[in-house]
Design a protein with these regions (language model features):
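Sec-dependent N-terminal signal peptides
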Residues: 2-13
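Asp-box/BNR beta-propeller blade signature and adjacent active/binding-site loops
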Residues: 16-130
Length: 130
């Protein structure tokens, strides 16, 4: 009987419907080739923050793309709704940022965003971590 109670409990826990949202859809903007390398965190106040590469002109990686920005969206209601896309890292053409990674300091509530940077006009093949 104990086995069946565990099975029933597990069934009840996972009976909620899964909902999938496409937060970053490149087909909605002809200037964007693709979105890649997502990062998502849950802040100490419950805000979900999703960041991602916005790759313009091509889907090429940092070394091959002169225009990669980092954008984000936030949700204040557990992912039911999301803010509009906000561009947070946007260097001049020839300088790009990619591969966002976020961490939360649970003591202070601060959110840190790290990313790769490359200036393709001055130092191609030199990655800097910001």
């Amino acid at each position: 009987m104990f086995k069946y109670l565990i099975l029933l409990f597990g069934t009840l826990c996972f009976s909620q419907e899964l909902v999938f949202n496409n937060l970053f859809d490149s087909t909605l903007n002809s200037k964007i080739a693709c979105y890649r390398i997502p990062s998502i965190i849950n802040s100490t106040n419950g805000t979900l923050i999703a960041a991602i590469d916005e790759r313009n002109n091509s889907c090429g990686d940092l070394k091959w793309n002169r225009d990669i920005n980092i954008v984000l969206r936030k949700s204040y209601d557990d992912g039911k709704t999301w803010t509009k896309i906000e561009k947070i890292i946007d260097y001049p053409l020839g300088e790009s940022a990619s591969d966002p990674s976020m961490i939360v300091d649970r003591q202070t509530g601060d959110v840190f965003l790290f990313y790769n940077y490359m200036n393709l006009d001055i130092a191609k093949d030199v990655y800097r971590f910001m």
